[in-house]
Amino acid sequence: MRTVVWQSLSEAQQESILERPAITEGANITAAVAQVIAKVRSEGDAALFELTEKFDRVKPASLRVSREEMDAAAARLSETMKQALEQAYNNISKFHKAQKAQPIKVETMPGVVCEQVTRPINKVGLYIPGGSAPLPSTVLMLGVPAQIAGCRKVVLCSPPPIADEILYVAKLCNIDEVYNLGGGQAIAAMAYGTETVTKVDKIFGPGNAYVTEAKRQVSNDFRGAAIDMPAGPSEVLVIADETADANFIAADLLSQAEHGPDSQVVLVTPSPVLADQVTDAVQKQLKVLSRASIAEKALASSLIIIAESLTQAVSISNYYGPEHLIVQTRNPRELVPLLDNAGSIFLGDWSPESVGDYASGTNHVLPTYGYTRTYSSLGLADFSKRMTVQELTADGLQLLAPTVVTMAEAEGLDAHKRAVTIRVEKLQKAQ
């Protein structure tokens, strides 16, 4: 990790060191994904079987995972694993249930009533990546809010063979439409539908460059599907003072660095002594990590920033807008009102990022790459939509009519004006 003193940098240099590396998917990926999407749209299930065999080197007997297969997966899991997943499920459920929107009903003026009601998105698709280790935590983070929101159809796709842990959590979340599908072909199938796979309205979940590009392409097509949020590399920023535990900070930085070589890891502290201690602790802990080579690549482009004060550290963090923000200071709670841009915040010595990744109850699907300025952590609202309702009495319309008529005339919209005046005239004749 490179250490810099913030005050010694020019404004241009400060902006430069906080600039994230460009995400370049490349023309090859864009074209390849477009071909996959076109093939799935034209050939349906046949394309899904062909592409699954080509990319995943698996030839599933069926695209859809049966209820019997899901029950068998549950039976194979250890009780310890089941209990851990159930505890995480309960915590995540509790936090997301608290997010339920309450109906709003306001009389804005006599006889004019406005309401806001919330409805679930009808059909949603969840993408769960494959890889060397299963990701049941991602199923929890997507499946629980979909379940609580009341989405009528929830479709889950994951590359075969699907891990028992993933199938067990799908069962916990009452997801019974699970498919042996990965990559861009899974996104295309959910976005457009096939003979077997249900077309959904919105797609959630992380993935590799091909999945990310497929989500981008289908979200730009009005015939496709909406998506959760833009994707980017994982990142963490730690604000710490001289009271922080250097070993804790090193562990938190490394837990993010092991995600991938493009992960962003930043420590901001007013204490040069702590900065040196963290540098030493990172090197010691790195030696015992199974993914040390990956973490080392991420650390090579990571930073320790020496700030003048915690106030300046907060300013740096707000400018950067990290996905994960850890605050290890003497009074971390006092900084919360000053923090504007972060996906999820972890306060104090006993709140490692890992708890949010798995089981504290918050959602680990977070905006990254600076999108925290405008996007929020995933929650119940993302699986819902708002509708407004207005109802006017005859007296209410007559009271509001002059305002609407004046504004419609100013905008040159005569039909808008007439939709009001024709009613007012009828009321006046009846008097």
From Swiss-Prot:
Residues engaged in binding substrate: S234, Q256, H259, H324, D357, E411, H416
Name of the top EC class for this enzyme: oxidoreductase
Binding site for Zn(2+): Q256, H259, D357, H416
GO cellular component: cytoplasm; cytosol
Cofactor: Zn(2+)
Disulfide bonds: none
PANTHER family given in the database record: HISTIDINE BIOSYNTHESIS TRIFUNCTIONAL PROTEIN (PTHR21256:SF2), HISTIDINOL DEHYDROGENASE HDH (PTHR21256)
Protein name: Histidinol dehydrogenase
Native species: Vibrio cholerae serotype O1 (strain ATCC 39315 / El Tor Inaba N16961)
Organism lineage string: Bacteria, Pseudomonadati, Pseudomonadota, Gammaproteobacteria, Vibrionales
